[in-house]
Amino acid sequence: MTVPPGKDPAPAPPGMLPAPEIAAILSGTHSNPFAVLGVHAAGKTYVARCFVPGAETVIAETLSGKELGTLERRDEAGFFEGPVALRKEQPIRYRARNDGGEWTVIDPYSFGPVLGPMDDYYIREGSHLRLFDKMGAHPIRHDGAEGFHFAVWAPNARRVSVVGSFNDWDGRRHVMRLRVDTGIWEIFIPGVPVGTPYKYEIVDSNGTLLPLKADPFARRSELRPDTASMTADEIAQNWEDEAHRRHWAEIDPRRQPISIYEVHAASWQRRDNGDMLTWDELAERLIPYCVDMGFTHIEFLPISEYPYDPSWGYQTTGLYAPTARFGEPEGFARFVNGCHKVGIGVILDWVPAHFPTDEHGLRWFDGTALYEHADPRQGFHPDWNTAIYNFGRQEVVAFLVNNALYWAEKFHVDGLRVDAVASMLYLDYSRKHGEWVPNEYGGNENLEAVRFLQTMNTRIYGIHQGVLTIAEESTSWPKVSHPVHAGGLGFGFKWNMGFMHDTLQYLSREPVHRKFHHNDMTFGLLYAFSENFVLPLSHDEVVHGKGSLIAKMAGDDWQKFANLRAYYGFMWGYPGKKLLFMGQEFAQWREWSEDRGLDWNLLEYNLHEGMRRLVRDLNGTYRSKPALHARDCEGDGFEWLIADDRENSVFAWLRKAPGEKLVAVVTNFTPVYREHYDIPLPVAGRWKEVLNTDAEIYGGSGKGNGGAVHAEKRANGETIATITLPPLATLMLEQD
């Protein structure tokens, strides 16, 4: 209906909607469509109103098909209203018709809200711990109809609509209801099937239509380059992992063997045509491989949905959605279940520090800096050109904390390795003077991020016993892996970046120069027990021109392999949990790239297959000898035997655990074959050589001690074993 300029519209008949309100519905500018659309009382009768574009006639019916009345078309664009034979407000449907045929539309505006006052209360308080069941898109049965409930936080928006193929991406069709107290918009849309792409159409407070937004809580997404969210069923996995989860819930992980295989799921292996494997294909190949290799856990680089392959998943736009690259979310649940059935844990890299600025993502979500800081000195990360979460907003903290809980509950993951913690903790991280905003005390500590991390860890450990949190924290921030009640951040473990840096620097030097850098290998023991450490040889060390681990080693090819074998033995004997990035277990020469599989053909060569066997046997030895793992995080599990033999670049120490056999670890980091080398041992008698990285089966020269050494008490009271030290090798000797 149009009104001539200068004239007021004709008044609507009693019970009928005024023309300006109809125009507002048709233009998508009505402030509250739920107040006018659907079924409403009109005196002692009821009237129904609907917007059905393309319809010429509309008949209102009950959900069971009983006719309630024919509605009048008030506007040719498809606005209908009229009296209906009802005694109360209830859900109804419409039978619409035009020259092309007939179709049925269930009226979303005839349904009441789904969220309740208790949801509002906990959301306002910031303490809602099941947002993942309330926000986003969930299949429900509501007032007799099947459909999807949508809910999204956009407190500063003038309008939010759900758009998708079910409404021809028309933002006027499913405008959501605003819950004013929380800023959450919601709507129940009947008849939307599983697997339907959708987004949110948002009009900001100034009336500007924003780029379509993906659902922050979406549990499934389209495959890139498409960016829509997708409706998804709840995960219906038949979990068979009770024994696995009970084990980790009942033990102290610091005293368990933990050897982690770090994997980029898109490039571990590929199909012959170069395509990525699905979760089911990965399960068939990766799980048996890890069992054979003796790893206790698989840690995946981020698998949350991300648009840009070279980001490796660290710039995620869908924290709640397993990436579509490997199939549906149920495939990941099956993968985790398969791991747990054979005793393998699954850890996810998790990125709560920052998010990309893709227009369909979180940045300026409702036309304001909602998830990020408005001030670029706080809200923009100069290293990665990404936005930084505003940890001072309780809604943002709840979004992130709930995401951590979501992966633990819905997918049974065993741990989260939190990425880029240092960038969260320091307000001046990668910033020059004047480019950052001090905290309330004038310091550079991000106190809001500290509180977030403490809250996240407290919630995870409080609700999901047995789930680990691991910090990638590259500075000396104190008490990262100490309990929150003791002033710590509350993580279970922390990556030991210092160990990785110092030892790789040492191994890159020619052996003749190593005596001048002996402290690179001993310094770490000064702080080795200040945190619960994981020793990480991660993906970060084999990219961006750094070369693979084998390429970093000094010397010719024989020395490179011997150096790396000795280094692995050194590391597996060193206190701390272990982490090794894929491909390094067989000494891949090429630097890792995310767009191709590993060079598995190298296993046809003895040196590479020998390296793989060594890592397998190191894992087996580490897991079977409590002395090597039961006191990884406690100083009483380590004792130096030889710490100062700079001239020979020899290191030796004792690993021990209460009531268990002692293990001595001896490393020779020169290519010199040393006979008659004396090492002190605490107990006289026979010590078995349980591992020798120079063994021929590993590609070494086969030098050693014939399977055992003997320690004797000498006249001066010392107990000494005279042993043979193979060149560039590590020995492990167990008290017999």
Curated annotation (Swiss-Prot):
Pathway: Glycan biosynthesis; glycogen biosynthesis
Matches recorded under CDD domains: AmyAc_Glg_BE, E_set_GBE_prok_N
Reactions catalysed, as given in the entry: Transfers a segment of a (1->4)-alpha-D-glucan chain to a primary hydroxy group in a similar glucan chain
A molecular function (GO) term: 1,4-alpha-glucan branching enzyme activity
Alphabetized SUPFAM superfamilies for the sequence: (Trans)glycosidases, E set domains, Glycosyl hydrolase domain
Coiled-coil boundaries: none
InterPro entries membership: A-amylase/branching_C (IPR006048), Branching_enzy (IPR037439), GlgB (IPR006407), GlgB_N (IPR054169), GlgB_N_E_set_prok (IPR044143), Glyco_hydro_13_cat_dom (IPR006047), Glyco_hydro_13_N (IPR004193), Glyco_hydro_b (IPR013780)
Domain of life: Bacteria
Keyword Iron-sulfur in annotation: no
Active site annotation, chain numbering: 419 (nucleophile), 472 (proton donor)
EC number per UniProt: 2.4.1.18
Family: Belongs to the glycosyl hydrolase 13 family. GlgB subfamily.
Identification of the protein by name: 1,4-alpha-glucan branching enzyme GlgB
Organism: Rhizobium meliloti (strain 1021) (Ensifer meliloti)
Lineage summary: Bacteria, Pseudomonadati, Pseudomonadota, Alphaproteobacteria, Hyphomicrobiales
